[in-house]
Amino acid sequence: MSAVGPAAAHLHRPGDSHSDCVSFLGAQLPPEVAAMPQLLGDLDRATFRKLLKLVVSSLQGEDCREAVQHLRAGANLPEEQLGALIAGTHTLLQQALRLPPASLKPDTFKNQLQELCIPQDLVVDLASVVFGSQRPLLDSVARQQGAWLPHIADFRWRVDVAISTSALARSLQPSVLMHLKLSDGSALRFEVPTAKFQELRFAVALVLKEMADLEKRCERKLQD
């Protein structure tokens, strides 16, 4: 199922009073989630629950296009508003479900949604999906969908030095030869200049450092 609608005006994210805890939505708030509080203003809880059920069915792999039309007709919602709400709810749940329950606690989830000015009763409904009885099924579907993509099964590399000779100069030009074997049996071979290889090393080291810093901050939050 896909819902497409023009992006609503972005809302400024309220200051995070829990500065030592990283938002499950990431460092940059997705625009479709930022638009939700304004769009939810006049929406009754019964309609939101129908919309939420529809989004959950979509996350479980069901075709919900016909259900979207029924909801729009029954709730008398403009197509643009409904599409934006579905997109925002889908992104919000998808981001929350990608984290294991041990990393995202119910209180943290609820507090962060309240800071986005999402109504309290709707926060409760969203939390019931992320931490309720449907979670195992949603995790199972996500794993099956992720299994479609091949992953790296083996990685090898070596340094190769090409010797260039001429009447004027003789230079050694090192490069890194890489060989990737994927889980689907395919193999990739490519050559990387040493300068690019050093950039890759730096980028990987930076990501690992940031991941370690995030883990430490979340551990401090859990200890508090």
Swiss-Prot record:
Cellular localisation: Nucleus; Cytoplasm
GO cellular component: cytoplasm; nucleus
Keywords, alphabetical: Acetylation, Cytoplasm, Nucleus, Transcription, Transcription regulation, Ubl conjugation pathway
Pfam family, one: COMM_HN
Domain COMM, residue spans: 151-215
Role played: Scaffold protein in the commander complex that is essential for endosomal recycling of transmembrane cargos; the commander complex is composed of the CCC subcomplex and the retriever subcomplex. May modulate activity of cullin-RING E3 ubiquitin ligase (CRL) complexes. Negatively regulates cell proliferation. Negatively regulates cell cycle G2/M phase transition probably by transactivating p21/CDKN1A through the p53/TP53-independent signaling pathway. Involved in kidney proximal tubule morphogenesis. Down-regulates activation of NF-kappa-B.
Family label: Belongs to the COMM domain-containing protein 5 family.
Protein's name in the database: COMM domain-containing protein 5
